[in-house]
Amino acid sequence: MTSTTSTVARIALEPRTIDAGGIETSYLEAGAGEPVVMLHGSGPGVSAIANWQNNIGTLAQRFRVLAPDIVGFGATERPDDVTYSLRAWTDHIWAFIDAHGIGKTAIVGNSLGGRIALQMATDCPDRIAKMVLMGAPGVGMTLTEGLAALRAYEPSHDAMRDLLRSYFAVDPAMITDELVAIRYEASIADGAYEAYRAMFLDPRHAGSELGITEDEVRAIATPTLLVHGREDKVVPVQVSVTMLGLLPNADLHVFSACGHWTQIERADEFSALVADYLARR
């Protein structure tokens, strides 16, 4: 039976801040044990809380979970001198991990967060214990209709609702008024829209920068769980199928009747799947 609602009670999550490489970084933290860093995707109004509020409670029962707002997103500082790029985002997450004194960690990355995780595994493979990549861009990624719609967003409550319901979930009922409000308010926070436009002013350039070659992927030996929604309109499931054939230590789980947001559309199953994978020795 397809799960369409989360039965796991949310835990109280109060944002914290830490200096990460000179950037005042907002993040969520819960639990104890081996560290798991959760990286949200891109898009207008994205943040750690909007991305992971249905999952942190389950994972925090077994791990120390940290979920930052990546520079340019959420409540994290937006320095005037930052040029948003894969390198800048990756360096910010390394600084965040270092600021917490963490040597080695697992990474759970959604969409853009998954691409950052791949770069981290390339940079310092000995510091990444495992990866979970959800709807992440990879080899063969092209500019889809969903990505184009994301980058064309102009702030309004109706535009945010229509964007999320049209491209992110198979069942529009999964896009709650609460989620729309969280995303919309974040998209009009001071400097948020300007930062988002700066990231994706030229979608062709942004897309090419996030690309990765087959040889680069084959060189990543980190144990990896690929998770994808079969009906994903933002990053097609075929991207993960291709990555499965290239990553030497990868498994793939595809959720049927599911779009780009596996962690929201199939929250309970996703959280249990990820927790079990990360706990496996």
Regions found by a protein language model. Give the residues of each.
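Short beta-strand/loop motif that positions the catalytic acidic residue
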Residues: 220, 226-228
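Catalytic active-site module of serine/aspartate enzymes centered on a nucleophile-bearing elbow/loop
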Residues: 250-281
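Flexible "cap/lid" loop of the alpha/beta hydrolase fold
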Residues: 118-122, 129-162
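Active-site loop/oxyanion-hole signature of alpha/beta-hydrolase fold enzymes
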Residues: 28, 57, 67-108, 272
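Gly/Ala-rich beta-loop-alpha elbow adjacent to hydrolase catalytic centers
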Residues: 109, 113, 117
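Conserved HGGG/HGGXW glycine-rich cap/lid loop of the alpha/beta-hydrolase fold
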Residues: 23-75
